[in-house]
Amino acid sequence: MSSKKKQKMKRSSSTQVQALAQHISMSAHKARRVVDQIRGRSYAETLMLLELMPYRASYPIFKLVYSAAANASHNKSFNEADSFISKAEVNGGTIVKKFKPRAKGRSYPIKRPTCHITIVLKDRSKKKTDQDMFLGTKNV
């Protein structure tokens, strides 16, 4: 990724990994259309869906999901087959404003929206409920 597009990984708990892509050059509304389709799905199903979707927003989201899974397997020893998208959100970023020259010395403003995409992966095999922790049983 270029220096403008940053990717971060945050550690929040032992069963989830968060990946963040910032300043992606597309409208948040168009990216939300794709993110709404993958929320709650398994990792393998998500990759298959994103490869087949005809939207321009699916490629950066595909790269982010793939990177989050690689970070999860490397840093937290998650099995990618057991991972699923627990949270996926798109927030609006800054708007890049340009001016296009027009006839007779006029200019026309152009607004290029950006967005920030957050993907949270959870591991089903390491998921424990409060009751299981209290009773000491293992959730399979």
Curated annotation (Swiss-Prot):
GO cellular component: chloroplast; large ribosomal subunit
Species this chain originates from: Calycanthus floridus var. glaucus
Listed transmembrane segments: none
Gene Ontology biological process terms in this record: translation
Chloroplast listed as a keyword: yes
Subunit annotation: Part of the 50S ribosomal subunit.
Name of the gene: rpl22
Location within or outside the cell: Plastid, Chloroplast
Protein's UniProt keywords contain Ion transport: no
HAMAP family associated with the record: Ribosomal_uL22_B
Keywords per UniProt: Chloroplast, Plastid, Ribonucleoprotein, Ribosomal protein, RNA-binding, rRNA-binding
Protein name: Large ribosomal subunit protein uL22c
InterPro entries: Ribosomal_uL22 (IPR001063), Ribosomal_uL22_bac/chlpt-type (IPR005727), Ribosomal_uL22_bac/org-type (IPR047867), Ribosomal_uL22_CS (IPR018260), Ribosomal_uL22_sf (IPR036394)
UniProt similarity note: Belongs to the universal ribosomal protein uL22 family.
Role: This protein binds specifically to 23S rRNA.
A UniProt-annotated Pfam family: Ribosomal_L22
PROSITE patterns: RIBOSOMAL_L22
Molecular function, one GO term: structural constituent of ribosome
